[in-house]
Amino acid sequence: MDIEQVMQYLPHRYPFLLVDKVTELELGKRITAVKNVTINEPFFNGHFPGAPVMPGVLILEAMAQAAGILSFKTKNYSPEQIGIIYFAGIDGARFKKPVKPGDQLVLKAEIVREVRGIWKYTGRAEVDGALVAEAELMATLRDKP
C-alpha cells in the first residue's frame, strides 16, 4: 500500500501520520509497514536539540497506526464506513535503541486476538533489522458519530 492507500485507512494527517507505506499484509494475522524518519520531523526541534531522537511514544503510536490498518483491512472496512479504531492500551513497552533522522523504521504488528471489538496485538519496531521497540497494544472501534 502506498501513502494514498494508507490515508484511506488512517484518519491521521501531517504531522501525526506515522505510516508511509505498507510492505506486507496478511489479513487477520500480521502487517509490516514503514515510517521514513527525516530531520524535518517537527518533534526533532525539541527532542533533543543537537542530538535528535524520535520520542518513544511516537514509535508506539506508529506501531498502533500500522495495527489499525491491519484491523480495518481484516474487517474490510474504512474509517468513513464505520468509525475510528482508537489506541486503547499498552503493556510491556520496551525501548532498545534510539531512532534517529535518516532511519527507516519498520513497524510490525500481529493480531493476538479480537474479542467483542477489543483488539490485542504484539508490536515491534526495527531499524536495519535490529529491534528498537516492542509492546503489546490494544485498540477498540468507536462508531462513526
Swiss-Prot record:
* Gene3D superfamilies reported in the protein's UniProt record: Hotdog Thioesterase
One GO molecular function term of this record is:
(3R)-hydroxyacyl-[acyl-carrier-protein] dehydratase activity
Which SUPFAM superfamilies does this chain map to?
A: Thioesterase/thiol ester dehydrase-isomerase (SSF54637)
What Enzyme Commission number(s) appear in the record? Answer: 4.2.1.59
InterPro entries found in the cross-reference section: FabA_FabZ, FabZ, HotDog_dom_sf
Asked if the Swiss-Prot or TrEMBL record annotates the protein with the keyword Lyase, the reply is: yes
Q: What class of enzyme is it?
A: lyase
Q: Which UniProt keywords apply?
A: Cytoplasm, Lipid A biosynthesis, Lipid biosynthesis, Lipid metabolism, Lyase
Active-site residues, record numbering mapped to chain: 47
- In terms of superkingdom, the source organism counts as Bacteria
Q: Name one GO cellular component term.
A: cytoplasm
**According to its UniProt record, where is this protein located?**
Cytoplasm
Q: What does this protein do?
A: Involved in unsaturated fatty acids biosynthesis. Catalyzes the dehydration of short chain beta-hydroxyacyl-ACPs and long chain saturated and unsaturated beta-hydroxyacyl-ACPs.
Q: Which family does it belong to?
A: Belongs to the thioester dehydratase family. FabZ subfamily.
> Which named protein is this?
3-hydroxyacyl-[acyl-carrier-protein] dehydratase FabZ
Q: Which organism is it from?
A: Thiobacillus denitrificans (strain ATCC 25259 / T1)
Q: What is the lineage of its organism?
A: Bacteria, Pseudomonadati, Pseudomonadota, Betaproteobacteria, Nitrosomonadales
